Amino acid sequence: MSRRNLALVLAGLGAFLLTLIPLTRLYVSVHVLKAPLEQQSMTRSVAESATYLDPVTMRPAVGDLVQTRWLIGDVLAGNDDRAVWGESVSLSTRDDERLDYHERRLAFDRRTGAIVNCCGEYLDDDTAIRQSGQAFRWPFNAQRHDYTLFDLRLRRPVTAAFDGVEQVRGVETYRYVQRTPRRLVPGETAPLPRHLLGLPGTGDVGLARYAEIRRTYWVEPVSGQPVKTLDEVKETLVTADERGRLTALDAAFRSTEADVATALNTAAAYRRWILTLGTVAPVGGGLLGVGCVVAAVWLMRRRSPAAQDEKQVPGDQLADAR
């Protein structure tokens, strides 16, 4: 191959590699930074020495509680832009005596994690509800500002405020906190005998359920993956005149160490993909592309030895030589 042809090949290769830089970043943002359609996971959070209303005696009891959460993806209902997952949350004692249960189905944007109202959305027995905010995760490259979530217990959007940066097992995370003051919990609450609330007289009395919630999320920001949670909940049953009240739940649910480790591994996998395809590949390709272009220019500017000799030999000597 002649020097000129080699220079042209190098120039073309360099231009191609430089063109790949924005294309690689676009590929990462479109195809890599997406939540999966398929999902099947189960996590647990445990509240030690919690106070709860025993469903048998209908009196406050103290013991460990377990909150179990299942996530199942509906692959056929999703597409390139949205995923559809079902979520079930069950609250029970260590003896598997169920105290509470919620179930919902929703769609969300696979890149931002924002809820999309479609695809048979429901929460418990309410099919008309329209949920909003983040679903199951933060957006990729989460920012240090507040985000909106949808609270299953309160059935309404709430704010998770950015609360600082914290290391979780050596990994930098952003901490977000939902602080919800005393608020009425929607739905019917079964009446209880008056004497259980310390009220005089006989018969049952109607009640309303109120909740105070402080929920903390630790989110790995690059992947948007929540890696740990602390769910502090206090629920109180109150009569209409507020003369009678009873603690229904006072607990602090913490993620298990095994679930924290699994979530950190998931976040690390996303980070590796993003680093490789979003930074290493473009930078490496860019440096190689620049090198090819520089080499091509150098070859084009450098004359061949024969041409240099021809320039140095006088014209009459060239004629005699011929």
What do the PLM-derived regions correspond to, one by one?
Residues 304-322:
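Cytoplasmic C-terminal tails of single-pass
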Residues 2-144, 239, 246-247, 254-281, ...:
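Extracellular or lumenal secretory-pathway regions
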Residues 292:
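Conduit-forming functional cores of very large proteins
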Residues 135-229:
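Membrane-proximal low-complexity regions enriched in glycine and acidic/polar residues
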Residues 47-49, 179-183, 234:
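Solvent-exposed coil/turn segments that connect beta secondary-structure elements
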